[in-house]
Each structure stands twice: as structure tokens, then as C-alpha cells.
């Protein structure tokens, strides 16, 4: 998400010379992981929702309500001070109260998840009911914005007739300095170590792969951090995969890691738009992915630049990986096709859509 924001801000500031202010809530004095261009206003409201993580449910709920009131108060004061033309907010954050702030700006909401993401956990009981209620509340919320932006045509169809609904994908700002030649016996996966990314499913699929001695010299590298790290490492150890599966910390040199791999695998339960897939394919990696909602159908041409697998089919994911692992010529052919994804998602095309949206009816 931070890279997506950075790319958009950089274009608006460096190419169009717009005044841009980035407002955050939980920086705790930390610098952004990726440096923003000089001249960008960086303001942290010091709300710090994350300070309540790990607390008992009731304390966490009361803390959230208190911090939300503080968030609204401080953001309202800031907007009345700087008087922006446009307020572009990322769900969830401040989206619940931004439409009600009367500062004279046009309000834009970006959703970087699919419409179904509240339902992805398939929870039952009170938590399942809460998920359904939140989904219904979202349907009412998005109608309050001047523009509502989703990332894929598939997601837009699920939202239906929403006033101001626009589809703008993320741009392939990533510039590949090196390209994969498809010869390395290495598979890569990138993302947070949590439920959404589904790396537990990938590890199970890799266990199946490793039962075939023909692929005993292949390795899987997962790059990311998150609350599932300990659990995933335990899975790796219990399945005897510690010599062929590694959990790696995030790196700012991910392009180098892509270039030294032969395919990307995505095992997510859901996404808004898989930016990792775009970046890896820009480096020449064919993508093997579950057909989760949303994104893979928009990006992967099955059998051309990657392989799609029915979501949740662990055996199918293993088979798809082995199809590419066992055919270097096919990997190299798909690698060339994968690199063409940058044409569809070029920064010029995508940012042209954003500029049109921001400048309409000014």
C-alpha cells in the first residue's frame, strides 16, 4: 500500500508540480519505509490506533472509539487549516467520517481490497454477523463520496450501480534493472505473513512438490513479516522443509530477488489488486496463482504469461508449479510474455486516469 501511495504522490509532485500532503496516524516518529519526494508535506496526527493492539476486546474497543474521535477532531482541524481541493483516503482509516467533514474539498475513496474481503474469513457466530454488518455498512458508505475507486473490473461488477464508481488499477511503476532468465531453480513469494496472503496453503503445496524427487533441488523463498511468522516456521519445520523453504525479512532490493528466481507464486485468500504480481512479472517472472478475488484474472493470461489455479486447490497449485519447474523452455517463453504487463499498467496510462478524476468538475 505504501509503495502505491508513494508512486502516485511522486508523479503528482514531480511531473505535475502539485502540492501534496500525506496524512498518517500511527508513525510514532518513524520515517516512512520508502522515502517520499522533497516538498511533500508529511503530517502525522499522532492518533496511534496500534497502541491498543493486544489488549482485551473491551479495552481495545473503547480505545478505538476514543482514538477515532481524536482522529476526526485532528483531521477536521487540519483540513480547515490547509484547505485542500481534494481529499483522497484509503479504506478503512478515516473513510467512515471524511464525507461529513465540511472543508470544501471533493472526497475520493480508494478501496485496495475486494468487495468480498469482509467475508473472506468465513467466520461464524457473532464475528460472522459482524462481518456481514460491516459489508452492508460499506455499501452505504461508498455512496457518500464524490468518487469511489476500485482496482479491477471484476470488483466493480460486484459493487454494481454505485454513483461515482471508477476503475483505476495500480501502476507498474516498478522499473526492472535485471530480468529473470528462467534458469534458476528458485520460486519466490512476497507479502505479509498473515491470513490474507495464505502462505500456509503455499507451504502445503510445496510439501507435495518436494515429494517428487525431480524437484528436490528447487527452493522456495518467502519474503515478508507479520504475525504468522512463528506459525509458518513451525509448519516448515514439522514438514521437514527447512532445507528448501526460507522465510526472509522484507528487502528494498526485491528486484534483485525476482531476477534470481524463475517464477512467482501467489497463494492469497483475497487481494484488492496484487501489486507484487505486477512487479514480479515486470522482471520476467511468470506467475502461478490461485484465482482468488480480485486481480489474477485481470493480469494473468492462463498458459501465456502464467497459470491460474482454482482458489484453494492445493494439489492444483503444486501441479502448476511443477508444470513450470519441469519445463525450462516454457518458463523462458512465459517470462518474455510476463514482461509485457508493464505496457497495460504503465504509469502514464494509470496516472492519466487519476489526473482526469482529480480535475473533473474543478
Residue ranges and their predicted role:
Residues 2-7, 185, 189-210, 227-233:
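A conserved mid-protein helix/loop that constitutes part of the nucleotide-sugar donor-binding site
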Residues 11, 16-62:
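N-terminal strand-loop element at the rim of the active site
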Residues 73-77, 128-148:
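Membrane-proximal helix-turn-helix segments that form the acceptor-binding/catalytic region
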Residues 89-94, 111:
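Short His-centered aromatic/hydrophobic patch
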Residues 154, 171:
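Carbohydrate-associated surface elements
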Residues 250, 269:
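Aromatic "clamp/platform" in nucleotide-sugar-dependent glycosyltransferases that forms part
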Residues 286-290:
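Short hydrophobic beta-strand element within catalytic cores of glycosyltransferases
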Residues 301-303, 307-314, 322-328, 343:
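Conserved acidic donor-binding segment of nucleotide-sugar-dependent glycosyltransferases
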